[in-house]
Each structure stands twice: as C-alpha cells, then as structure tokens.
A protein has these predicted regions:
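Transmembrane helical bundles and short interhelical boundary loops of multi-pass, membrane-embedded
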Residues: 293, 343-377
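Transmembrane alpha-helices of multi-pass, membrane-embedded glycan-processing enzymes
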Residues: 86-90, 99-110, 149, 322
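Short hydrophobic/aromatic helix or loop-helix immediately within or flanking a transmembrane segment
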Residues: 54-62, 71-94
Length: 377
C-alpha cells in the first residue's frame, strides 16, 4: 500500500513545485507531470496487476500467433475494433505489453486534457480521478480506452457537429459496446447557444428518469448485443441491502448535481467567467454533458444494488462527471458563502475525509492491483 499511498499524494507533491496553477502554462505542466507518472505506472504494470490484465495478454498472444480467426474458434466474442487493434499492434510488436502502453497513453491523455480544459481546480480533480478512476483503469482497460475516445470527442459536441459525434461513438463501440449509451447525447448540440437553468434541469432530469423507465429495454439491448452478459442480469444480482445503494451517497451525488446547475447559472446571469470550467462561458454543451454523467452516477448505485453488479461498469463513465463537478461546487460555494479562513478549513476537511476514503478504496483492492509489480519482474 505504500506505493499507492504515494500515488494518491502525487497531486499534492507536484503542487509544492508551483506557486500557482491558475496560470494556464503552470496548469498544463502540473497536469502533465501527474499524468505522465500515471501513464508510466499503468503502462509498465505486470501481469498480476489488474484482474483482467492476464486475459488481455492471452488474447494478444493468441491473435499474434494464430490470427483473429483463431480467437473466434476459441469461442470468445470481443468487439471487432478491439481485435483489429490487437492484430495491427501484433504485426509490429511481439510483446503484448504494447497493448497496455497504447491503452495507458490514450486513457491518461484524454483524462489529462479533460481536467485541463474543463476543471476549475486541477489538483482536486486529479486527486478524485486517482481515488476513483485510476485503479479501475488498470483493470477495465478496454472500457477505459473506449471512453477516452468519447472524452476526446467532446469538442464535436461544443461545435454542434452531430455527424462526427455519432461516428465517434460508433467507432468507440467497436472497442467496447457500453459506449453506445453516449449516442443519445448527440441531441445536446441542438440546444440553444444560451440555454437557461430551467432547460438544463429538464434535460438532466429527462436523462435521469428516462434511464430508469427504459431500464428493461436497455437490458434487453445489452443482452442482444453482448449475449455473454445474460448471466449478469438473470443469474447474478446484489441484494438491496448492499452499501452500493446507501442513501448517503445517492443524496450526496444529487446535492452535487443540483448545486452545480444552480451555481453555474448564477455565473451566467451575473456574466462572471466560470474559470476554465467551459471553453465558452455561454455555451452550455460541455456542462450539460458532465451534468448528465453526474446524473448517471446518481442512479448507478440503485442499478448495482437492485438490478445487476454489471452496472458497476457505469462508474467508469459517470464518475468523470464528479471529477469536474465536485471541485466546481466546492470552489464556487466557498467563494460565494465563506471567508478565506473558513475556505481553508473546508478544503482541509475535504482532503482529510476523502483521503481516508481513498486509502480505504485502495486497501480493499477490488481491482486486484496490490501488490504493484513491473512487467519485467
């Protein structure tokens, strides 16, 4: 755990070397240092780091030695895009470690760029990602890679380029079909340039309650697209008493969501710049995207507890909304309602509580990443 404790402290360690990270240049260097370290850790990990890492290596070796056809004869059925990616890499590189290098560089670059472009507190956002997302990225690497493609496509939403967004999502689904859930988000660019608070609230609520009402249809679609997931929905369920659906976390996510909506549109009304939260102050497309992810996080614990443990995979997507929204809500609330001394206390309490929580998450080792080892060991 000492190794991962240092990883959790990286946002604070690198912060010591900068007098300020509000400056765009310092912010870029700061985030580059953090995510370069995360890239190295993720890409050089050994076969025992991550529950699915060994299976990724086996798939690579099978396709490298016998071609894609041999993989299907072996009775498996991964997405074509993923298999083609492996085939191309295996024609150039013999060692399967290159697959993790590619996964890591794309995943960490996408997250680094997202935090740089849309977060008003890069230190807190980086810490939240390391706490909630980094360990997962060394296990669900294929899904993280597909979602990274989605994150890199956010500019298409900003520019209201409907066709490019649809093509991007369809491309990502050839790596992991779960990214198909982002196809309906293509309607966001159809919003007015100056959307208001009520409109955004309606969109987020429709997305939230629509996901509940259409749950059965969604499950049937998933089973149709990926038959091997049948057992997850009809053969494996959590009980309603699990901590995954605790009222505390659901209420906390809801509070973050609605505070973010409220504070963002207060900024709009007073014509105050929302730091680097969005590229253009009055373009609501990126903020609605992250609000929808946060809304998805609100409903995710319910799905995990009462439908299927498979919905834990939704967290790969939805928690990115929290990386952006939590720092935004805390910073804006502190600036608006608290004195300087009170702000310091709030930040200290936040980092202490979430630091303990982060240590607990890693200690539980739900992704099989402890102990860490390099691939040459």
């Amino acid at each position: 755990m000492l190794f991962y404790s240092i990883v959790l402290l990286m946002p604070f360690i690198f912060r010591v070397f900068f007098s300020s990270i509000k400056d765009e240049k310092n912010k870029k260097i700061y985030l580059t240092c953090i995510f370069m370290c995360l890239f190295i850790i993720s890409s050089l990990r050994g076969e025992s780091v991550g529950i699915d890492t060994a299976s990724y290596r086996e798939t690579y070796c099978l396709i490298r030695d016998y071609g894609i056809g041999a993989y299907y004869r072996d009775g498996e059925s991964y997405e074509y895009g993923y298999l083609i990616l492996i085939w191309i890499l295996s024609r150039i590189f013999h060692d399967p470690q290159i697959l993790f290098v590619v996964f890591s560089v794309v995943t960490n670059y996408a997250m680094c760029k997202t935090i740089y472009k849309y977060s008003n507190d890069p230190m807190m956002a980086s810490f939240l990602y390391i706490m909630w997302g980094f360990a997962s990225s060394m296990n669900t690497s294929r899904q993280q890679f597909a979602f990274a493609i989605i994150l890199l496509g956010i500019p298409f939403l900003e520019k209201k380029n409907f066709l490019k967004w649809v093509l991007l999502v369809l491309g990502a689904t050839t790596v992991h079909k779960s990214t198909l859930v982002f196809l309906p988000i293509a309607v966001i660019p159809l919003l007015r340039k100056k959307s208001d608070e009520f409109e955004t609230m309606i969109i987020v609520l429709i997305g939230f309650f629509g996901s509940i009402l259409l749950l059965d249809h969604f499950i049937n679609l998933v089973i149709y697209l990926v038959p091997r997931y049948y057992k997850h929905f009809y053969g494996q369920r959590y009980g309603g008493g699990t901590g995954e659906a605790s009222l505390f976390w659901i209420m906390l996510y809801f509070l973050i969501l609605f505070m973010a909506i409220r504070l963002f549109y207060i900024d709009i009304r007073i014509r105050a710049k929302a730091s680097s939260f969005i590229v253009e102050e009055r373009d609501s497309t990126p903020v609605v995207f992250f609000m929808l992810l946060t809304a998805l996080q609100c409903v995710q614990p319910f799905f995990v507890a009462y439908v299927s443990s498979l919905f834990t995979r939704i967290g790969v997507f939805s928690r990115v909304g929290l990386y952006i929204m939590i720092p935004y809500v805390i910073k804006k609330s502190c600036d608006k309602y608290f004195t300087n001394d009170s702000r310091r206390i709030i930040y200290i309490v936040f980092y202490l509580l979430f630091g303990i929580f982060a240590f607990h998450i890693y200690q539980q080792d739900g992704y099989g990443i402890i102990p860490y080892s390099f691939f040459w060991n």
